[in-house]
Amino acid sequence: MIGCCLVMASLAVTNMPPPYYGVYAQAVGAPLEKQIEFLSMPLRENVRGNSTYVNTRRYLLGPDNPNFLMTPDGSGLGQGGRIDASALEVQARTTENAAEAARCRALAAWLGKPGASSRRTDTLSPRAALHARAVEAIAAARTMPHPRVFATAADFAALKTRAEKDALLKAGVDRAIVAADDWLGKPTATYGLDGYRLLGVARQGMRRIVLAAFAYRMTGARKYATDALAEMKALCAFPDWNPRHTIDQGELALAVATGYDWTYDALSAADRETIAASLEKHALRADIPFAGWTRLQNNWVQVVAAGLTATTVALADRDRELCANHLAAIAECLPEAESVCGPDGVYTEGPGYWNYGMSFNVICLDVMKKAFGHDFGLSDVKGFKETGLYPALMTGPSGSWFNYSDSHGSTGSSSAVWWYARRLAMTEAVTEGEVAAFKEICAGKAKEIPRTLPFILFWVGEDLTRRTGTLPREWIGQGEMPIAVVSSDRSDRNAPYLAIKGGSPSYNHGHADAGSFVLDMHGLRWAFDLGAENYGKVEAAIGGSGLWSPEPDSKRWSVFRLGTQGHNTLMIGGKGQDPRGFATLTRDGDAVVADLTSVYPQARKVSRRVSVGRLDAQVVDTIEAAPGTEVRWAMNTDATIEWERKPLLHPNMYLFLSKRFSRIGVSDATGGGVWSEGSAQPENDWEQPNPGMRQLIYTAKVPESGRLVLTVTFSTWNAIKFPSGYLRREEPSR
């Protein structure tokens, strides 16, 4: 991510004498080639939250470093620094990051032939060219009247007209106005941290401001502008927007910038100045330019990008250079977060964080296109378009997500899927569950009104509920967190659906869950991922470094929901998975095979093969390890486990899982082991309970041959339970 950090270095100059110790001393005293290597190291190769690492990068990119590459305005080499272009060529050849390689080659070409020394030139560097384009964009935004953040007055007028003819849209608009009414007269926000987060306050502030500002634009009633102003002034009076937790700043920046812009004509000159000055202080001139988000590839980048982009558009007529610097930074950093979805669209942090990060991402792009006429090519980044179908692929017939990593099982409504359907004509992205969830919001039945609802309304429409495409029966998404889905028929709600996870536990928000799966049959979820933990409670119990460290000895892996023991995968030799490993997924005919060997160093080879038929699903594990090694197979379920066998009726079934009026059979695991029922509850009271959950467990030992094969088949054949008995169905076929 060298290019990303170079951008941020050009935003400001700080005097930071280097503390010569540890990684800092090693980096600043190293040859230039090593400095470049250090700057381009991805986050996962360093300790997350390491302030020494962050400060080192700041110094290497700052004017105190003789190799400082860019001047603050991005126009060329600064401080008389010299850099060997051959070092950039080496970095371009060795890095696995295609975007980084392209930047290195471009800069090397600008410097001259490989091996030549640095030279000054009037030719713009790639970074300076991007900065020049940002200056032009801000200049264009300055000419636009308010409102200009995300939508103009003409856009609001068009939305009113469209709502008159679109029942779904009208229901959404009406609900947004009712929600704005509910906020009237309530106390405004107060500063208060939850642990080290201000996020709860930020989100409620965004919800109130954006709903009120939207209601003002749609009705013209000044009571809504007055309410938005009261909340904005309360937030602007905060001592800070909590730069320690950067997404707090990002959400607050988007909220206040949108509210300021959409209610601009109702604000007094004094109120305009108060809000604009606070936005400049808390967003544009705060710690954001040097915060750790610039070196990340996750939802933080997307949230901060949306907030800062909205702020630069809202304040374009104040400080053009300051706004352009931020805009150029976003245009270079955001592709790093988008590209993680490549090549096939998988979001590494799971569908819950996709919903969060991508919603802010697409808001950011629409803000850019409305104000500048383009989005700096951000919508063309490889993986960005492909990820539009990701939530639909992760949604089983039960309506629940494959909620790996820190995701919750409930899908709810997603802003971004409506954007993909509207902007990129991906109507298959809008599932029946998404439409139902949006209608629940409109009917006032949802637990909470989405704070992004006013933005969604510019995309939603009845025309998008008529899906024109179909989802694939089998799909493998490769990349940094491989995911696969196998189903016999995505159009049949009763058909088996199985999704499995590969990748590494060490990724941001990752769990030790390689090989873990979820299973839907009869339109119900039978095998569950327990989902996310409560960050605040866990941090209070084991510390932030304990929760967020990905190291093998981290306390993170002892938390039930995060460690191997709480997932639908294997424990081998009494041990969980090594977070330094990486599980791959490959296709084998209609099946998918997960190579789990690198996450289980206690075994020679481990693989899991999953497949589905029309009426059944199968999981086959092959473990090669020392004879006598114990293997524990586990699956979280909320079903009742029925141990009574009826060999004549069900010759291939060893036990049954039942709930409601449904029942599925489970075969013996063919490994010479023992089935049992275990607890799915954590040992500590500071961990989230898992009500109604239990674990179906199979324990076996590796035989003398050193090779254990466990085959578990789930079947709906002759196993559906009705009050009057069993309904016999046709034989399964593969």
Task: Pin down the residues of each PLM region.
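Carbohydrate-active enzyme catalytic cores, enriched for enzymes
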Residues: 315, 353-526, 586-595, 698, ...
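Acidic/polar, glycine-enriched structural segments that form the non-catalytic walls/loops
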Residues: 120-178, 184-193, 217, 240, ...
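Mature N-terminal, pre-catalytic/accessory segment of carbohydrate-active enzymes
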Residues: 13-70, 74-88, 94-166
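CBM-like, beta-strand-rich accessory domains located in the C-terminal region of large
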Residues: 439-442, 537-734
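Aromatic-lined, polymer-binding surfaces characteristic
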Residues: 146-163, 169-400, 407-408
